[in-house]
Each structure stands twice: as structure tokens, then as C-alpha cells.
Design a protein with these regions (language model features):
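N-terminal nucleotide-binding beta1-loop-alpha1 segment
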Residues: 1-21
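Short beta-strand/loop segment that forms part of the nucleotide-sugar
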Residues: 48-58
Length: 377
């Protein structure tokens, strides 16, 4: 058995329903798996982490077999996360744990890995967001079995759960592209591809996937112009927006609302909802075209307010503006309007208006994360 002496990364990649072959959901699943391996390898090579324990299905196991920096645990059909975590801790005698989501941590640097390692060893628990976290580091010896057993099944809630149930000293990860950038949508992959020149396993995958057809150039051109103005809408962290704004010449007009939507599950109130009700959609889209030269929208709020029941595949198709294949009537209508817009508009979720915009602003500033840079991270 592996002797765990450092920080042990753990990830659960749990797809309860296998995506339909050829779907956007399938492409996202496969791309996230490549990201897991790239990120796990970089953590292991940094010298601050042990092998990553990956908990997943048989398909992921086949990909992981030949890798010396991962240990694979086959997932159970119905998983209770807390029960499974305690089982893994006891099986491998783990103490210092770094749990990360598949789409996170890709741009964390070696210095940031060092920061996580040193402060976790000091007894602090760390995450990139106290409310909805993408990664979290803690010592299992500081927790009772009862606390571990009752971990929420949704990993974004881990940080807020520990803050509410324990007296552990919390340390928020400093804001950077590495701590903010997370991949949940097709446009996140397109942005990753753009700023890395398709480095690593994930870059190779994207360059041969449906994501390679996503055009970001028109929007990047708008970001690069002093005379341009963009509209950013969604669950925007003001600090992330400030850091992006420092890098880009264009002006930013933004509306930030509904942060915490994922935890609540439904949009509660919305200024945009008021605008949509007071103006018809045609007038509102014309307004966007008149007041700005480009946009980047977190559509999950809009769909929560107006779309009713919908499949995740419809959301991904909307992100890629493939409105013809969308089943939900509202999402189809909305996406068609965006696709026909005279200005370039990027669609996505929380990640695209935070880490995505920050990454594009770095690109405009001239900072590329090519293979030579990635090798130093």
C-alpha cells in the first residue's frame, strides 16, 4: 500500500447517468477526465502532494491504469459522500486531505501548491470560496467521525459545511487565475484552449473535440479595444471582475446578482427578470446591441427564472449556440436570439463570468499559458 506522508488529493468524478454518445455532455465528461489527470500529475510533480486518489467508474479506471501518480477506487452506484470519505480515510490512514473538483486547480502554480501544503500542515483549512468551493484542504484528525459522515453530497458545499459545523481556523485562498478558474461549460474549455495553445492531455483532447469550433476571436477583439464596451451579467465576484478590468482596455458594464444560486437551487429575485417583464425580449436584445459591443452572460440565472424544466444537454447546446437541437422552448428561443445578435456574446455559467473573463483578460494583456509556462507551474 502507498505510504501517504504529504497532502493527499482526492476527487470523486461521479456521473450518475452516462451521457448520450456524441452529445456535448459526453464531450464535457471526457474533457474533465483529461483535466483530472493533468492536474493530478502537476500536483504530484510539485513535491507537495502524494498520489491522487480518484474515485470513479470503470471507464475512468481504464484510463488511470497506466499512471503512477494516481490510485483508483471504483465508485459505488449510490454514493453517500461522507460515508465514502471516511472509508477512504480509514483504508489509507489519511490525515491531510485536499479535495478538488475535476474542473478546478488547473492553473494553480507550484507556489500556490506550496501555500496549500504549508498551511494545511499548520492545521488550517483552506478553500477558494467560503460559500461555494471548488477545492478544500483540511486535516481529518481535526474532525469527528460524525462530521465526516455527514459531509454534503455536493462538493461545492464542503467549505460552508465545515465553517458551520467546526471551529477550524479558516484561510481563504488568495485570488488568482488558479484559484478562480473552474470548468463547467463548453466555453470554459474553449477559453482554456485559447490561453494554453492546447497544452497537455486536455489541450490535445480539445483540439480534436467539438469545442475547437467555438469562436472567441470576435469577443477578444472587443476586449482589446479602448473604444469598446462589454456587458457582463451573472453571479460575478467583484474582486474577480476588478482583477479582470485591470487588464483590458475596454469599458465594462455589469450586473451582478443571485450569488449563491447553486446552494438555493432557484433564483429568488432578479433585476433582469424585472427588465424582461417590463420590456419584450426583442427590445431587450436591441438594447444590448445599442449600449455595448459584446457580452458575457451567466445564463443559469435566466434559465432558472424563465425556462422551467430542462435537460442539462440543452444548457450546453445553448452555450455553444446550437439552438436547432435544443428541446426546451425558452432556451431554444433565447439561444437563437443570441446566435443572431450583431454583437459577440459568450454564454456559460458562474465560471465563465469569473475565471473565464479573468483568463481572457490575461490573454489580452499578452500573458499566455503555453507549454513552456505550464512546465514551470
Amino acid at each position: 500500500m502507498t505510504n501517504f506522508k504529504k497532502i493527499t488529493p482526492i476527487i470523486i468524478e461521479n456521473w450518475n447517468v452516462q451521457p448520450q454518445k456524441g452529445s456535448v455532455s459526453e464531450a464535457i465528461k471526457e474533457a474533465r477526465e483529461e483535466m483530472i489527470f493533468d492536474t493530478s500529475h502537476r500536483m504530484f510533480e510539485s513535491g507537495y502532494f502524494d498520489s491522487t486518489i480518484i474515485i470513479g467508474n470503470e471507464n475512468l479506471l481504464q484510463k488511470a491504469k497506466k499512471l503512477n501518480f494516481v490510485i483508483f477506487e471504483k465508485i459505488e452506484k449510490k454514493i453517500n459522500f461522507g460515508k465514502y470519505l471516511l472509508k477512504i480515510i480509514n483504508k489509507y490512514l489519511l490525515d491531510k486531505i485536499f479535495y478538488f473538483g475535476a474542473g478546478s486547480c488547473y492553473f494553480l502554480t507550484k507556489d500556490e501548491f506550496k501555500f496549500i501544503s504549508e498551511n494545511t500542515i499548520k492545521g488550517q483549512f483552506i478553500s477558494n470560496n467560503p460559500v461555494s468551493s471548488d477545492f478544500i484542504s483540511f486535516s481529518s484528525s481535526d474532525l469527528t467521525n460524525e462530521i465526516i459522515l455527514n459531509f454534503p453530497n455536493i462538493d461545492n458545499y464542503f467549505s460552508s459545511y465545515l465553517m458551520s459545523k467546526t471551529f477550524l481556523k479558516y484561510l481563504k485562498m488568495p485570488v488568482s487565475l488558479g484559484s478562480v478558474f473552474d470548468i463547467d461549460t463548453p466555453n470554459d474549455f474553449a477559453i482554456l484552449s485559447k490561453i494554453t495553445n492546447n497544452s497537455g492531455n486536455i489541450g490535445n483532447y480539445i483540439s480534436n473535440s467539438i469545442f475547437k469550433n467555438i469562436d472567441l476571436d470576435k469577443f477578444i477583439k472587443v476586449l482589446s479595444s479602448k473604444s469598446s464596451e462589454i456587458f457582463v451579467y451573472g453571479r460575478i465576484n467583484p474582486l474577480n471582475l476588478y482583477m479582470a478590468e485591470k487588464n483590458i482596455p475596454c469599458k465594462i458594464r455589469f450586473l451582478s446578482e443571485e450569488r449563491g444560486l447553486k446552494i438555493r437551487g432557484k433564483a429568488s429575485s432578479s433585476l433582469l427578470k424585472y427588465f424582461f417583464k417590463s420590456e419584450n425580449f426583442d427590445n431587450l436584445f436591441k438594447l444590448f446591441e445599442n449600449i455595448c459591443d459584446g457580452g458575457i452572460f451567466d445564463t443559469r440565472i435566466i434559465f432558472s427564472l424563465f425556462a422551467g424544466e430542462y435537460e442539462q444537454e440543452d444548457v450546453y447546446l445553448s452555450d455553444m449556440k446550437i439552438w436547432q437541437k435544443i428541446k426546451n422552448p425558452f432556451i431554444k428561443f433565447f439561444t437563437k436570439k443570441i446566435a443572431e445578435s450583431k454583437i459577440p456574446i459568450i454564454l456559460g455559467g458562474h465560471s465563465v463570468v469569473n475565471g473565464g473573463l479573468m483568463a481572457l483578460s490575461n490573454l489580452v494583456r499578452g500573458k499566455k499559458y503555453d507549454s513552456s509556462y505550464m512546465s514551470q507551474m
